[in-house]
Amino acid sequence: MNSITKSYGSKFALNDVSLEIGPGKIVGLLGSNGSGKSTLMKMVTGLLQPTRGTLTVTGLPVGLKSKALVSFMPDRPLTESWMKVRDAITFFQEFYDDFDIVKAREMLQFMKLNESDRVSVLSKGMSERLQLTLALSRDARLYLLDEPIGGVDPVARGKILDAIVEYYNEDSSIIISTHLVRDIERIFDEVVFIREGEIVMHEEVENIRIKYGKSVDDMFKEVYAE
């Protein structure tokens, strides 16, 4: 991502953002609501086009070819209310050539989800577990998870974080957007702080602890209190 700007008239959703993520990293994209996190993710998936700047995934310009490399879990469910869990799995298997049905069923068991359950009766936490299962069961190079623990209880959060660590492909990278930093910082290798459409910090988690003597959550509070 090189010098990306996304504007709507005179309002900038992203302003001259440059970012490079290496393979094998779990990266936290941290910011308050409206900071530009979701816009950035949608641009990497190709759902939004930049006003200016260039975007690539493993060297490929973002477009039709790069979409096969990116698995996106948006902040709204990808499933329909009429579906059962098995219908959602079947839909993804038929739609994505890289969908691993064996991995999906293993994750369902880990998540304590039944294939016969109706999507419409799943709790918020169970629904998020299903969405994560669908996203991580693809053999992608980049996984984008938009607020995967937002609005779920602490038990569900723990299960979701454990699943991310257990099932993500270590040759790939994951970008996780969130504002719930304390609950999730334990799984991050790097963090990116975004505020008002601009990146204000990109740092390895260990460096934050050594250089600043702070947790990621403490640094987040400091940056956003300014």
Spans of features found by a protein language model:
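The feature captures the beta-strand-to-loop junction immediately N-terminal to the Walker
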Residues: 30-32
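ABC-family P-loop ATPase nucleotide-binding domains
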Residues: 75-130
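ABC ATPase "signature
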Residues: 202-203
